[in-house]
């Protein structure tokens, strides 16, 4: 394996591990130390940090369909791995999007499989948005990276700029 290829894989694996570990540590700490619904920290006028158990997906869609959501999460993680192996993306932005999607999906899939809910804890005060977690942030940043890739870097046939 070439040095450039090793370095390419190293940053991707390192970032994925960092995100999943940070997601797990925050969620495990919150579950061990706080009650559901408890606000445990606050940034005045910006955000509350509160323990929420989300049995649904984004925006609490499909609430109480844990088995289906677990299956979808696991299939998404597996699909990303297969996509990465088959397409062998080389560009930074495309790889970043995949790593962020993978890490976020894996973090929430772990919750769904083990606990039957996802631990959420970040509640933005000035924006009416559902409570979320670090894995959710990774997924959103992955979507942003994917959009940037498609708009500015994708040179595939039919998508030339």
List the predicted regions and their residue ranges.
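Alpha-helical transmembrane bundles and membrane-interface segments of multipass inner-membrane proteins
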Residues: 1-161
